[in-house]
Amino acid sequence: MSGRPQAVPTVQVDNAEVIVTEWRFAPGAETGRHRHGHDYVVVPLTDGTLLLETPEGDRHAPLVAGQAYFRKAGVEHNVINASAHEVVFVETEIK
């Protein structure tokens, strides 16, 4: 365990087509290492910076409120809020 606070997921929709989850990250909060089993789209609700810990190395990723991005299934990472404020995004996994 890293000792970081945990990001808070709230599943809003889970049906045969999609899983829609709102993620809230306090400063320094993390998801924990995980692998995505589905393609997914993220829509940031706040600006901020995430630290992505991946098998290929760490990198920072800026978030811009309202600027969506898409990722393919198989992505493996731990997502950490590297901002000094809460970061919120909605993730839609496509089944």
From Swiss-Prot:
Name of this protein: Beta-alanine degradation protein BauB
Domain Cupin type-2: 23-90
Role of this protein: Involved in the degradation of beta-alanine.
Organism, scientific name: Pseudomonas aeruginosa (strain ATCC 15692 / DSM 22644 / CIP 104116 / JCM 14847 / LMG 12228 / 1C / PRS 101 / PAO1)
Gene inactivation effect: Cells lacking this gene grow normally on putrescine, cadaverine, and GABA, but growth on beta-alanine is completely abolished.
Organism phylogeny: Bacteria, Pseudomonadati, Pseudomonadota, Gammaproteobacteria, Pseudomonadales
Induction note: Activated by BauR.
Pfam families: Cupin_2 (PF07883)
GO BP annotations listed: beta-alanine biosynthetic process
